[in-house]
Amino acid sequence: MEFNISQLKWTRKPQSYDIKEDKIEMITKPYTDLWQRTYYHFRNDNAPVLQMKTKEKYFSFVVKTEFESHQRFDQCGIVMYLDSENWLKASIEYENEAFQRLGSVVTNNGYSDWATTSIPASIKSMWYRLSRREDDFCIECSNDGQVFQ
């Protein structure tokens, strides 16, 4: 599967963006998120999503994110999005000056499940590798783009 910016489509556009062959930059509007029915009893499906469709059943892609978080719940990550009720994301969510949460959210049939681990708030970039093997998906992360866990 080749990356081709002409195949990218917005589900929802951010406040501003710049797309190049080797880099995508975006600034989101405040209070945007992807989240569905869970313990917190609220639903959000208003975050910007830039997608590329594929019929491939076996693929992996790697993305490096760089971000500046300032307020609690600021997030930066990647998403595989089918519709508002079925998607998965990997992201870092800022909590405070001491720590933030590296996590994944899997949403299936409208219900989100969030798994996290705390990491230092000083981390301002993260590599993600998402892989699909038919109906199975794997999310991995890396600090250096070489060693993924």
Residue ranges and their predicted role:
Residues 1-149:
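Extracellular glycan-recognition regions
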